[in-house]
UniProtKB/Swiss-Prot annotation:
Its main location: cytoplasm. Transmembrane segments: none annotated. Bidirectionally degrades single-stranded DNA into large acid-insoluble oligonucleotides, which are then degraded further into small acid-soluble oligonucleotides. It is found in: Cytoplasm. This is Exodeoxyribonuclease 7 small subunit. InterPro entries: Exonuc_VII_S, Exonuc_VII_ssu_sf. HAMAP family: Exonuc_7_S (MF_00337). It catalyses: Exonucleolytic cleavage in either 5'- to 3'- or 3'- to 5'-direction to yield nucleoside 5'-phosphates.
Length: 85
């Protein structure tokens, strides 16, 4: 999900992957990891701020994915009502 704040590669998705390229599940999973790391504590201020900023970006992207899904459902339901109405 994220790189270790000390720069060590944890073997998960790097924080350098643009948020815009992540699907909903990847954003959600990385956001959960960011929250876990922040709650765990022990990070210096700069590392905490970098994680927090990444978390904000991930949360916004998750909301965009969910808004798109809601719109798709609304569109399908509106189309069904128009055909049956």
């Amino acid at each position: 999900m994220v790189c270790d704040p000390n720069g060590d590669d944890t073997g998960r998705t790097h924080a350098t992957v643009p948020v815009s390229q992540l699907g909903y599940e990847a954003c959600r999973d990385e956001l959960m990891e960011v929250v876990r790391l922040l709650e765990q504590g022990g990070l210096d201020l700069d590392a905490s701020l970098r994680l927090w900023e990444r978390g904000e970006q991930l949360a916004k992207r998750c909301e965009e994915h969910l808004a798109g899904a809601r719109q798709r459902v609304s569109d399908v339901l509106a189309g069904d009502e128009a055909q049956n109405g």
